[in-house]
Each structure stands twice: as C-alpha cells, then as structure tokens.
Amino acid sequence: MPKRTDIKSILILGAGPIVIGQACEFDYSGAQACKALREEGYRVILVNSNLATIMTDPEMADATYIEPIHWEVVRKIIEKERPDAVLPTMGGQTALNCALELERQGVLAEFGVTMIGATADAIDKAEDRRRFDIAMKKIGLDTARSGIAHNMEEALAVAADVGFPCIIRPSFTMGGTGGGIAYNREEFEEICERGLDLSPTKELLIDESLIGWKEYEMEVVRDKNDNCIIVCSIENFDAMGIHTGDSITVAPAQTLTDKEYQIMRNASMAVLREIGVETGGSNVQFSVNPKNGRLIVIEMNPRVSRSSALASKATGFPIAKIAAKLAVGYTLDELMNDITGGRTPASFEPSIDYVVTKIPRFNFEKFAGANDRLTTQMKSVGEVMAIGRTQQESLQKALRGLEVGATGFDPKVSLDDPEALTKIRRELKEAGAERIWYIADAFRAGMSVDGVFNLTNVDRWFLVQIEELVRLEESVAELGINGLTAEFMRHLKRKGFADARLAKLVGAAESEVRKLRYKYGLHPVYKRVDTCAAEFSTDTAYMYSTYEEECESNPTSDRPKVMVLGGGPNRIGQGIEFDYCCVHASLALREDGYETIMVNCNPETVSTDYDTSDRLYFESVTLEDVLEIVRIEKPQGVIVQYGGQTPLKLARELEAAGVPIIGTSPDAIDRAEDRERFQQAVNRLGLKQPANATVATIEQAVEKATGLGYPLVVRPSYVLGGRAMEIVYDEIDLRRYFQNAVSVSNDAPVLLDRFLDDAVEVDVDAICDGERVLIGGIMEHIEQAGVHSGDSACSLPAYTLSKEIQDVMRQQVEKLAFELCVRGLMNVQFAVKNNEVYLIEVNPRAARTVPFVSKATGMPLAKIAARVMVGQSLAEQGMLEEIIPPYYSVKEVVLPFNKFPGVDPILGPEMRSTGEVMGVGRTFAEAFSKAMLGSQSGMKKSGRALLSVREGDKHRVVDLAAKLLKQGFELDATHGTAVVLGEAGINPRLVNKVHEGRPHIQDRIKNGEYTYIVNTTAGRQAIEDSKLIRRSALQYKVHYDTTLNGGFATAMALNADPTDQVISVQEMHAKIKNMKA
C-alpha cells in the first residue's frame, strides 16, 4: 500500500546533545529520515538542540528548531507549526521519552497529532520492564529471573529472591546509566540508590546475573503487512556483564550454528509482533548460556539505535531511511534498494561476504580517579569499524583505526617483568579498555586457550584466531626482515597485519617494509559493500580493502577529484564537529562538479553514509591505508584540515610521499603548531602573548617558572582537547606534573605560559583565500580563561566586549592569516584582560566551533573554505562581509561526569565535554536560559543558593549575591565569603566546611537544601578539599558553577523564560538576509 495522504507535515524529534550512550549515530539516522520524507513530498519540521549535526542544517528540513527537546518547548513548536504527525524513533531515548511525555501531557491530543513509527503503547511495552517480561512469557520466550523495585525496601526483597551477583538497571535511561553489577549487599545499596535517583519513573529492574553468557543482537525491520527481515546479526566478542556499547562486536555472528541462528531469527520477529512494532527498525538482544544453550531475551529497542547505525554501515542497508518510509505507510516490497540501483527490493534480506568488527574507543585518561573497569554502564565515547574478508583481517584493521597508538596486537606488558602474569590475569578477569591486547599478551606468556577462556568467557573460536596471530608474530620476529618473502608477506597482509606492525616485529622502519612490499608488487584490492554478496552489480562506490586477486574499485577519471580525510573514531576533543566539516566539504565540492572521495572508519557518522560522497572508502585513516587509496584514485587534491588531529598528523608524511595536499600547507600548519616558529611570527607582527617559555627538563622548568611567576599553564606541544594540560600553582605542583605527564609528547618540549587569571577568553573563526580574510564570528566565552575552550559556553555576538576590542582582534586575525599563509579555515584564541588583547593560540584548520558559527550566522564556513581550497576566491563566492546576527546564540556544553563517580567535576584546561547544545534568543539571557534547559542543567528559578568562592573572586561575589537576592534566593555562604558579604550589608546564613564540624555543606546538600551552588577554587590543595562539594552537587542534581563568570551568566538567565518563544533556523537566517538588504 502506498504512502499515507492524510498527513502532510511531520515533526521529527532529534536526540539532543552527544552524551556517552547516545552519540552521532542519531544525526546519521535523523538526517536520513529528513531526506527520505522530503523526497516523498512531506513538509518536515525538525527539533534538535544539537547544533553540530548535519540534520539541523537549514536545507535538511522545511522548518528546523535548534531548541531544547523539552515537552513544553516542543508544545510551542507544535502550536506554531501544526504538524499532522510526530516521528519519535529517530532520536534515541531522548526522543522516545519526550514523545511519551507529550502524549501524557495531552499535547498530541490537543493539537490532533498522530504518532507514527511507533505507538505510545509499543514504546511503553518495550521500555516498561514488567510489561516486557509478561509479553515475552506470553510468546514462550524466556527472560532473566528478575524483579522490579521502586524503593530500597522492595529492592532488598528482590535481591533476596534473585541472589548475588545481580544486575541492576533503571527504567527509561540509556547507555545503562545508573546501573551496575552488585556482588554484595553494600554495592547493591549504593547502585540502587543512584539508579532510583536517575530513573525518570523511579523504577529499577533487578536481574539474575548472566555474567559470562554470550550476547547477540538482531537488527530487524518490519512493515505493517508483517513482512520481516533481519538486516544483520551481531555477536558480542565480550560476554554478558559488559554493556554492548562497550563490547567489541562482530557482524555477522560467527559462533552460531545455522539452527541456533534460525531459532533466534524467528524469536526476534515474534518479539516485534508481540510488542507491536509495525513500521520500522528495532534491535532485539539475546543471551545464550554457553554451558547448556539456554536462550533468553534481554531487551528490545523499538527505535533505530547505535546497533542499527552499525548494521546499516556493515551491510549498506539504510535502516533509518527505510524505517522513515515504512512509518508513512509503505511496505518493504514497495521500496527499492539504492545500493543495487533498484535491482532488488528492500524486502530482500542483505547477505554479506565479509566480516565487520567494531571496537569502542575510551577516554579514561581524561578522568583521573574514574573506575576504568567495564560494566553494564556504558563508558566508551566513540567507536571504529573495519571490514575484512576474515575475522583476523577485520580485527587487526579495527585495532589500528582506533588511534590509541597500536598498529595491531602491540604488547602491553614486558614478559621479563616478574609481575607480568599477575597483571595479565587481573586484566583478563576484570575487563578494562585494553583487554583485547592483554589476551594476546596472555598467549605470549604461554597461557592456553582454555586458561584465557576461564578468565574472560570470550568464545574459544575468537581466542584461537588471536592465538594464531600471536604465533605468526613470533615467527616474523624470529625470521627478521630477510624472512619476509613475497609469499609470506602476502599471507601476513591477508591476515590484516599493518606495515607498521611488521616493521616493529622485524626491527625496521615502516618505510622499509613498505618499500619491500612495493618491490613484490603487493597492494590491496578494493571490494564493494553491495548488500547482496556480489549477486547483483552495484551503483554505489562503497569500498573496503583486502589482499585478494580482483579489484572492484574501478576509479573513474572524467571529473577532477578531491579526497577528504575524516577524523576516525569519536573521542573527547575530536567529535562530530569535525565530521560536520568533512561532510560540508564533500557536499560543496559535489555541487561544483568535483568527484569527492571520503576516507573514514567511524560507523556513527554522516560522512560514512554511502551517498554523502561520490566514493566512500571505509578504511582506517593511517598513512599506509591513505597512500594505497591515493595510488589507485590519483586525486587532484587531498583535504587534511577538516578531520581534527587525525589527518593533520599525516600531513607531513603524505606530502613527502608526493600526495597533493590542498589548502594551508603542512609547513604553514607546523609554523602555527611549533612553539618556537610561532613565537618568531608573533614577534615579527608585534602581537602580545602571555609571558611564556619552552623547556625540555624539570630543572629548566623550575628555573623559568620563577621568572614567569605562578600560576602557570603547562602543556606538551601538538595536542588536541588539552590532553595533559594543567594549571600549576607552585613548584611542588610543577615537579609533580613533570613526573606524571611529560612522557605524553614525542621528543617535543613542554610549554609554560603565565596564566591570565580572570581574563575573558575569545574564539574567532575566519577564512583566508590569500587575498582577503573573512571573519566568520567572534565568540565570547562565558567561563574565564583557564577553562578549555571546548568546555566553555560561548556567545555570538559577544555579550560584554566593546567594539574597539573586537576591532583589535579582527586586525590581528587578518595579520596572522597572511603571515601564516592560510588557505581555508583558521581559528584564533585570544584572552582579554584589563582591556589588553593577548594572543593564546592559532589553529590553521577547522575548529570545533565551525558548526556553531555556521548555524548562528547562516554562513556555511566549511563549504566556503572548501571552495577556497580548490581555488575559488572569497570575492568569486560573494562572501566578503562578516555577519553579526540580530539575535544571540549561546553554545553550552554537556559533561559526562555522571558516568564517572569519583571524578572531580571541575572545569579546567583539559577538555572533558562530550557534546553541546545551542540556545537562540532575543537577548543573551534568553539564549543562555535555552542553552541551560537544552543541556538539562536542572536549574531552578529560586530556593537557597550556596556561595563559596576563592580569594581572587571575593571582590566580585557581592554583586552576584545581590543579583541572586533580587531573584528571590535565600543565601548561604562559607566563612570567608560570608565575611565579605557581611561587610557589604548582605547577611547570608553561615555554613560549615566539611572539616569545621556538622551540620556541614555535605549534609545540607544531601538534605536537598540547595537549588544552586557557586564554588570557585584555586590551588591544588583547595581544589582537592572542595571536591566533595562538587561531587555531591552532581549526585543530588543541584545546579553548580565552578567559575564566577558562569555564576553571573546563570543569574542573568534566571530572568528569562526559555519556553516563551521558539524560532526556526530558517527564520533566523531570513532575518539576517533582511538586515543585509
């Protein structure tokens, strides 16, 4: 039956900011849904607070609202836009929860909006643990022994029945937030307390432990005529007990017999029927007890998910796009498969003749004090995917694409160390982020497959594959470089060994191994992902490399080609913003008639969608892989400045190998990144910088520090996201830094900068074409200097800076752009103190603020800069004027501290945010209030506020206190702060610090006395002493600021109503056009 004609407009709910457990896979699914529904002629209205997404670009929908995904705000949008239907299955848990709330509040009924893609009842039945259990029993499927609790008393009763160890999961949360495994009563009570707090329905599911069972997932698509297909089966390499988002996963499932697979296939279809998913994709998770084969259903998600993004990329079957069309009434047999050029219908189940491996990427090094063991609560921040013809090839390709310094199974421990075996055993038993490497180490240390299995519960089939690779490595090392015959090398390359890994094993340089391989004429061939195991020919060029005979890449040569290098797996400091830039480069150059080639290995992103570029190579962004693709494609130009540090690190070597890099030259990039060369340029231009020095030893550092004066910002050169960057307050601190952190940098010195306390930090994005400079936007940070720019909220236009100061910055940016010969994008960071402008740093590449500036001003910076790189001047593009919008846009960040109990949630020079939201308003206050609502800060309008500030902030705290009183807050203060306020005639209630006796701050936070806390500190000891205040504020959901500037901005925002007015991106950009006219 064709599409529904009773609906004309559809509201799509997005997923909001990127958090652990819900990343950019929902930008990929949302963008697909927008495209699919618009090509069917529907009017599409989109709401998503995440500005860094492709789906919130103005061309993607008819009306785009970058507004908080909060039911009251969405009600305003529904009232204004009057959609006929709402599609809630594209935005993860956030969208489902919002849709249920709109239903509950009667908003959908009030405006006559139908829910499509899933019914409220089906969502509830899948998400409500008790209803789900009953439904499974009804169709004869087993679930884990479990019970439901709404308070501690009920929880303990369930535990008595289920026994320890047991698994605790809160309802309606995602990424396993608040859950965990309890081995005893003490742990049980702690996890339950946290879980009850985090579940919106105050409900816990307590399950028997399935630790050590095997875990499988089925990606199922069903239409309203009950056609069901399995897009892909996925097997978890790691056994139950580790969240599937933190597990290494493999597709298709490798260790099921056909009979077991058929049973699971039928069961997953039965689950969709019973839950009532009539249109679209779902994922069903199963667990199998390896001892007796008992099969149970763990859960199902009635929406597209992280796994469906992986399944889409693994098979080439666009689940989100098909699901969107099914939601408006199509059936699977009516839809055609794009990849085979319509030669097969969508009801044709994909079959694949290769193996796909996904490995998660973790960032524990950014969270000192975090528990880095893997449990049922998700902690990874990104993932890499690789495709190979065998499990071994696929696994080794994924390991090198992860960018954690491994080129394959590099050893983690030295076998000479007497503690080696103890350490290996511990790492195998209690899995951390690096367990896969310790498994290889275990085989090196002589453990047997059974021995490793008993500690890890990883299926023996996978272990045998790894053991074989370790034995091969041993023979490579033994034979040396002369033993690498043509035959042996081909064998090794087919097993997925990288040149760099072989080089390490034989003790040679990577270039020598590559030279030898070229001498043998050994190169990879490229196979296509075609959904049908080569049964039909394919129209899309979606490729992966392997060492076989026949190459299917068939490059074309009639159009000029440009290759874009992506950013690899997401991590803190290099996320979706860089993918956004890569996608824009591809889109702009395609519009201009270039053939675009994308190279990336991140399965969550829009850049790895088969129709974003003309040709997609799903490959790791490493020197070896990129050189091979360049060899076969011969592009006119390669863009390295859009994918963050990943491609930039390769720029020099690519250039040396004769690869044509376009845009800013690698040498110019180096001039900005290398401290001494940069200093020369700055001195030549006569610009001001904070007093600084470059040192290579601890003695030098101590000597220079005395001259510069404390506090100092210390950091290694060449890092992204402030890795290993700290503020040190005295010599003891400095010495500790050198002992703990200095090994971060490769032969590079450490930089000391005088720390400008209380300065206002500013980011400027600009584009230079060699003749003129276009200022994209000047963003004023809300948190003062010393907080990493990626963790600070910022405003465009600036909200306190004078026009004169901004003009000084404009002139300096222009001088720097010409001095450094920038071609394309650049980002400059300044600090302003006492009306003086100091230059902090220059990055001649795409910065993470590019999507924000593009949305706020309507100028697609990444597209403009891509055109500059291929030789179109700014004048030819008609892009000469900086745009200062007639409204405020504020970007606020989202931090993952709730996933890492034990970590101090204070902002500092090392970046730790995972995502961001944007708020738009007529005033700064209105925009910031929306950004706060969008980031789910939970700020209340009144109540009791606690002020506890450091010495340097005391002169400004009186003003903040007065503002809060005016807003109707009652005030508490710690001793030093109270004295200052008292002198100004404000008398707060005095509270004890923890060491001053009870009742102290901690008690009062636990009792729920505060709605707001401002706590600023300086100096390592003071920060350590006040850590508990911040941890408790986070745990008890009290909004807190760790900078005074943040406090002032919050006080301003309290005067505004974030649900008062909604404005679409299209209306915002129209205002700019009118203003120009």
Swiss-Prot record:
Catalyses which reaction(s): hydrogencarbonate + L-glutamine + 2 ATP + H2O = carbamoyl phosphate + L-glutamate + 2 ADP + phosphate + 2 H(+)
Keyword Amino-acid biosynthesis: yes
GO BP annotation list: 'de novo' UMP biosynthetic process; glutamine metabolic process; L-arginine biosynthetic process
Positions contributing to Mg(2+) 1 binding: Q285, E299
Region described as Carboxyphosphate synthetic domain: spans on this chain: 2-403
Cofactor(s) named in the record: Mg(2+); Mn(2+)
Binding locations of Mn(2+) 3: Q829, E841
Region (Carbamoyl phosphate synthetic domain): 554-936
Pathway: Amino-acid biosynthesis; L-arginine biosynthesis; carbamoyl phosphate from bicarbonate: step 1/1; Pyrimidine metabolism; UMP biosynthesis via de novo pathway; (S)-dihydroorotate from bicarbonate: step 1/3
Record-listed ATP 2 binding positions: R715, R754, L756, E761, G786, V787, H788, S789, Q829, E841
Residues involved in Mg(2+) 4 binding: E841, N843
Domain ATP-grasp positions: 133-328, 679-870
Residues given in the record as Mn(2+) 2 binding sites: E299, N301
Positions that bind ATP 1: R129, R169, G175, G176, E208, L210, E215, G241, I242, H243, Q285, E299
Molecular function terms, GO-annotated: ATP binding; carbamoyl-phosphate synthase (ammonia) activity; carbamoyl-phosphate synthase (glutamine-hydrolyzing) activity; metal ion binding
Any single GO CC term annotated in Swiss-Prot or TrEMBL for this entry: cytoplasm
Keyword Manganese tagged: yes
Residue positions binding Mn(2+) 1: Q285, E299
Residue ranges of every copy of the MGS-like domain listed in the record: 937-1077
Binding residue positions for Mg(2+) 3: Q829, E841
Domain of life the protein comes from: Bacteria
Subunit structure: Composed of two chains; the small (or glutamine) chain promotes the hydrolysis of glutamine to ammonia, which is used by the large (or ammonia) chain to synthesize carbamoyl phosphate. Tetramer of heterodimers (alpha,beta)4.
PANTHER family with a match to the protein in the record: CARBAMOYL-PHOSPHATE SYNTHASE [AMMONIA], MITOCHONDRIAL, CARBAMOYLTRANSFERASE FAMILY MEMBER
Domain notes: The large subunit is composed of 2 ATP-grasp domains that are involved in binding the 2 ATP molecules needed for carbamoyl phosphate synthesis. The N-terminal ATP-grasp domain (referred to as the carboxyphosphate synthetic component) catalyzes the ATP-dependent phosphorylation of hydrogencarbonate to carboxyphosphate and the subsequent nucleophilic attack by ammonia to form a carbamate intermediate.
Family listed: Belongs to the CarB family.
Protein name: Carbamoyl phosphate synthase large chain
Organism annotation: Yersinia pestis
